[in-house]
């Protein structure tokens, strides 16, 4: 009995320590989640002009199918564990668009480990972020510049990431960034025809500027799209991690309650058994006293009255 009681007690102490550790992780994750949520709050305002520049930030199936040159895919993955199925969803998204034109440049350690084994021919190299600092414009510029270097004659650059919808829902999203030459052709078409009426004034105003300014404008909004993608993925990561940690706390609480119940029942059973033995001994002593059993000295035999 004492061995089983000691086992339950050690288990309960271990669960209590584990619960305190996971609760601390939850508080840290919640703070990071709120910080990332504040940074991504301006996404609808900042992407308004990026959408106008690229017409459609989301991937266009027709444009991708009509591409003659390479298509650079930039899947953004997470480095941390306990983030749900974020990385698996990114891998499934890449599986659905595999083609002979695909070139991979993943972002994140787990993405590099996975895609270098799954698609060794399409994989070029990846970018690792230690995630010690929040996502910033300089990092996004570094990502898009390396994407240009991976395939200089690529038609399009597809940034695949997890878009934050709510704390419990994250969905795959794609930003479709054309090459500079393709973008200029599309800009000229928008400025000279009525095919894109919503971009007519914008295209004409930009066409009147110098070539270097147009190039800087393109690079700025391409980096801004990447910045939004990595920021969204960071927020989705913290949200998924928060939900996973909450599930861990629920599981640990149920284990604590179950072990505490077993510990209390075992302890109660041991106390009850000890009380029964004491009461039995007292009853037998009282019975002997009533029969007149007397012993003057402990080494002498009992003498009956």
Curated annotation (Swiss-Prot):
MF GO annotations: hydrolase activity; proton-transporting ATP synthase activity, rotational mechanism
Keywords: ATP synthesis, CF(1), Hydrogen ion transport, Hydrolase, Ion transport, Membrane, Mitochondrion, Mitochondrion inner membrane, Transport
Entry superkingdom: Eukaryota
One GO cellular component term noted in the UniProt record for this chain: mitochondrial inner membrane
Localization (cell): Mitochondrion; Mitochondrion inner membrane
Cited Gene3D superfamilies: 3.40.1380.10, ATP synthase, gamma subunit, helix hairpin domain
Pfam families for this protein: ATP-synt
InterPro entries listed in its UniProt record: ATP_synth_F1_ATPase_gsu, ATP_synth_F1_gsu
Topological relation to the membrane, as annotated: Peripheral membrane protein
UniProt function note: Mitochondrial membrane ATP synthase (F(1)F(o) ATP synthase) produces ATP from ADP in the presence of a proton gradient across the membrane which is generated by electron transport complexes of the respiratory chain. F-type ATPases consist of two structural domains, F(1) - containing the extramembraneous catalytic core, and F(o) - containing the membrane proton channel, linked together by a central stalk and a peripheral stalk. During catalysis, ATP synthesis in the catalytic domain of F(1) is coupled via a rotary mechanism of the central stalk subunits to proton translocation.
Family statement: Belongs to the ATPase gamma chain family.
Subunit architecture: F-type ATPases have 2 components, F(1) - the catalytic core - and F(o) - the membrane proton channel. F(1) has five subunits: alpha(3), beta(3), gamma(1), delta(1), epsilon(1), plus the additional subunit P18 (Tb427.05.1710) that is not present in F(1)F(o) ATP synthase from metazoa. Subunit P18 (Tb927.5.1710) interacts with the alpha subunit with a 1:1 stoichiometry; the interaction is direct. Subunit gamma is part of the central stalk. F(o) has three main subunits: a, b and c.
Protein name (record): ATP synthase subunit gamma, mitochondrial
Record organism: Trypanosoma brucei brucei
High-level lineage: Eukaryota, Discoba, Euglenozoa, Kinetoplastea, Metakinetoplastina
